[in-house]
Regions:
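A generic local structural motif
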Residues: 88-91, 121, 162-165
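Short, conserved, surface-exposed binding loops centered on an aromatic residue
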Residues: 95-97, 123-128
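Structural preference for beta-strand elements that scaffold enzyme active sites
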Residues: 22-26, 66-70, 99-103, 130-135, ...
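Active-site clefts of carbohydrate-active enzymes
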Residues: 68-78, 104-110, 126-159
């Protein structure tokens, strides 16, 4: 009961305090597990059950009905198990009228990142759900790229260029 009370009070207090003044809320961040299908084992999933994500969005919607509500996660840039789990989660939330957008965190390596076509396909399938898509975080590591500094930086520029192009190609991808 204490966790539920704190969970509900926090969302109501923060979203309610800024009601009408904040464009969008990242309501839930990084809930999908990296290693196994489904949600990560956290204090919230263990203490409140698997529907805590939907409950957080319900509470946020009630506290600030005009704000865009966003689910945000990393590791699902292209088409993979994690991006499929994120897709399944936000599809369910969208069908319930709870989520408006999804943020994709891209912490990627210039030496091994998803194919640009896969990144664009993932953005497109999220947009096809009626969601606004944002690349909410992005960094491109160059430590493992072979070559001198100029070569590494050129590769990094190309990765940034490719990801931005993938976003721009999908009308509902709003920002990088």
């Amino acid at each position: 009961p204490e966790l539920r009370i704190a969970f509900e009070d926090h969302i109501r207090t923060v979203a309610g305090h800024y009601r009408g003044r904040v464009y969008a809320w990242d309501v839930v961040n990084e809930a999908v597990d990296d290693s196994v299908a489904g949600l990560r084992s956290t204090v919230f999933s263990r203490g409140l059950g698997p529907d805590y994500v939907a409950e957080a969005f319900r509470l946020a919607r009630k506290a600030d009905p005009e704000a865009e509500l966003v689910y945000n996660d990393y590791g699902g840039e292209g088409l993979n198990r994690k991006s499929n789990d994120v897709y399944t989660l936000v599809k369910d939330l969208k069908q319930r009228g709870l989520v408006d957008g999804v943020g994709l965190q891209m912490h990627i390596s210039a030496s091994s990142f998803p194919a640009v076509a896969d990144i664009q396909a993932n953005i497109q399938r999220l947009a096809d759900l009626g969601l606004q898509v944002n690349i909410s975080e992005m960094d491109v590591r160059i430590k493992d790229v072979a070559g001198d500094a100029a070569t590494k930086l050129a590769r990094q520029r190309q990765v940034y260029r490719d990801v931005v192009a993938a976003c721009v190609a999908v009308p509902r991808c709003e920002s990088v």
